[in-house]
C-alpha cells in the first residue's frame, strides 16, 4: 500500500505537469497561418489644428477575426473607427479596408462595413419594423428586398416578439440587438462595434455577446471592437491598446498577459505559521492572506518552489495575469468606467 507521502508526491507531479501542458497548449493554439487582411493601417494620423488625436498608428486586422481596440476616454479609439468608416477624413497616412483605399474608394468601403455606434442612430418614436425598413431603403432596397434580408436575421435576433414595438420602449439589450441587425442589413464584411455594451446590465451584455458569437460562427464576420470591459477581449484574436493617440501595445491576449503581467501562486496550508515560512522562502513581501491561503506574485520558478515545499503545501493554483493587469502595467491607470 502506498504511503500518504508517496500519494502526495504523485499529486503534485500530476498537477505541475497539468500547468506545464496547459501553458504549451495555449501557445500552440495561437500559432496560425498568415491570413488575408480585412484592414491594413499605415501611419494613420488625425489632427485638429495643433492637437493630434491619432498619432501615426499602424496595425492590421485579419479577415474573420475579432479585433479588440482598448483605451481610455480620449485615447483615439472612436476617432480611428470614424476614419476607417469614412465618417472623418484622415490627416495623413494610408489605410485599406477590404482592399479599398481610404480617401480614394470610400463608396466601396461603405458597402463593406456595418457600424454599431455607442449612441444609437435609430428613431425612438418608430417601431422596430419602421426603423429597419427606413434603414433598408437608405441602402437602396425595396420592401421585398429588405424583408428578404431580414429573413436571415429574424430568428437569430428574435425580431418577431418586438417587431411592432417602438424602439424607445425596448430594454437596453433589445436596443443593441436591433442596432446590430440594422448594421447587418446590407451584409457587410466588417462590423465595427464602438463600445457596444456600455451602459448595459450584465444580463444584457451577455445577450449582446451571445449574438456576436453567433454571427462570428455562422457569418465569418470580421469584428472590430472598442471596449473598456477587459473580459470582452478574452475571445479576441488580437488586441491593440491605445493611450493619448498612440499604440502602446499589441498582440494576442495571451501574449500581452505574458509580456506585461506575472503569474500568481495561491497555495493552501493548514496553519498560517507554515504559510509565513513559505513567504520567507519565496523572498517576496507582495502577498495577500485569504482565509486559509496566500496569494503571492512570482515571475519564475513556481513549480520548483512548490515541489521544494510539498511537505507544507496541501494544494496550489497558478493564476495568470488579467487584461486589467496589462492595462495597469502599461498606463499606471485602472480601466474603470471609461469609454469613447
Q: Each PLM stretch: what is its role?
A:
Residues 250-251:
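ABC ATPase "signature
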Residues 264-334, 340:
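Short, charged/small-residue-rich alpha-helical element at the C-terminal edge
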